[in-house]
Amino acid sequence: MSISTMTSMTDGGCDQSIKILKTGINVKKVVEQLKKYPQDWDHQKTLEGSQSLVDRGFDDLPVSALQLIIGGVKHKEDFVGDSEINIKTPAYAHHSEIRKIIRKQFKNADIHRCGFLSLPVDEIVGAHIDEGTYYLSRNRYHLSILGRYQYFCGKETVIVEPGTLLWFNNKLPHGTVNIGDETRITFVFDIPHGQS
């Protein structure tokens, strides 16, 4: 794997699988809101009608999630990865600072499914591909909030510091390792093609 520090991005029309779009973004106010609302972590598990992908046979991951916009389905047997339904969670209103940063970077783009993911020290999220038709028309991004981590996608790998905004090709195998000395928190979000 090669270490990359790439810039600029279009709607996936290139050979790179990871692109660093910006570094040094001030995420202090985001961290303050996360500390103010600790009860928001994993709150989506208690929402009426909510079902985990683990319940549907997908591998469990060593992460906690604080989802602001989740995918929805019309029928219980439908696969959320093939659904275009996006639903704001109750925690959405608590986390305005992250949305301000995204709006500053992407102007009038629609933010679709999004949330914070935490990963304990030395833990790994193994290689996986985000499955379903939903992902075919969207770009996926990370904005690193806390901790230092190694991120890999395809044959590329980068070391990510807090305040780093990156795009990656989630149609390729990708994953991460927390190489820092604190829990890694990143904000993962989707923007439709043509808006990023």
Where are these regions (language model features)?
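Short connector loops at helix/strand junctions that flank enzyme active sites
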Residues: A109-I111, P120-D122, L136-R140, L146-R148
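Asparagine-centered strand-capping/turn motif at beta-strand->loop junctions
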Residues: T176-G180
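Short, surface-exposed beta-strand-loop junctions and turns on beta-sheet-rich folds
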Residues: T133, T157-I159, T183
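Conserved metal-binding segment of the jelly-roll/cupin
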Residues: I159-P173
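Conserved short histidine dyad/triad with adjacent acidic residue
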Residues: F116-Y134
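A short hydrophobic beta-strand segment most commonly corresponding to one strand
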Residues: N139-S144, L165-W167, D181-S196
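Non-heme Fe(II)/2-oxoglutarate
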Residues: M1-F106
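A short beta-strand-loop-beta hairpin characteristic of the jelly-roll/cupin
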Residues: G126, H142-E161
